[in-house]
């Protein structure tokens, strides 16, 4: 197998739990393919640089054939220099007594700076995935601070929600996730997201013909919406490995394409599709080909139930945007 030229992959919050579950898989070729060498450009805050050094030592000790180089830094302009892919994992977690608005503002400062740095030094075709929460609004903040980059280059991760929704449906219908197609997560990566089974199939049969409507509305949707909180309660820590897995899958799909007759959920720049306000980063069903995404057309969202759920999560995203509006260029 002939090797390609190395590509540059930036990861922020690189000494954190999600990154620890992700970096070794990126370096082994799981994200971009077994013929694609990578240079990892790792960003951390100064107090975590020692911890990052330990992670880098471990990466070296794996002797990955595809790992063509490693940069470790606390300077965003160094980390993002010429990068082709940027996974923005690091964010300010919610501390005791912090209101959601405080959290939004603390993260706005981080993602404004990162958006500016990407704008200044990244590849013009950089693909950006925001994992750090609140992911949709953090992606919007970064995008607004990078006026020279195409807004389509900025995405937020709802693939974890998508995967959670697939797993729950497979469990209920006594099938495997391979049997589940055309899952949709609409809206925000938060508890207002709308896991929509209207178009979903299991083994070619419509999902909503196989499950009870009461279960769907009363059990399934809240379970998917609140799965992250359930994991924190059970594990005493937030989901890291499953988030890392979803981030790798999101990027891999964006770069290498979706399966035929299926789609994925991605938080992407709204151009008014399905009546969603333009400029929000909203999760839509998407297909990917040739390194580009497009929103799936023609999903039936005419039911009062769908309209209400899609509007509620859109409203939350609008409120988040308005809370940081004074910080947006």
Swiss-Prot record:
It catalyses: (S)-malate + NAD(+) = oxaloacetate + NADH + H(+). It comes from the Bacteria. Its EC number is 1.1.1.37. Pfam families: Ldh_1_C, Ldh_1_N. One of its GO terms (molecular function) is L-malate dehydrogenase (NAD+) activity. The active site is at 189 (proton acceptor). CDD domains: MDH_chloroplast-like (cd01338). Substrate binds at residues 94, 100, 133, 164. The keyword Lipid metabolism does not apply. GO terms for biological process: malate metabolic process; tricarboxylic acid cycle. Gene3D superfamilies: Lactate dehydrogenase/glycoside hydrolase, family 4, C-terminal, NAD(P)-binding Rossmann-like Domain. NAD(+) binds at residues 13-19, 107, 114, 131-133. NCBIfam families: MalateDH-SF1, PRK05442.1. Belongs to the LDH/MDH superfamily. MDH type 2 family. This is Malate dehydrogenase. The gene is mdh.
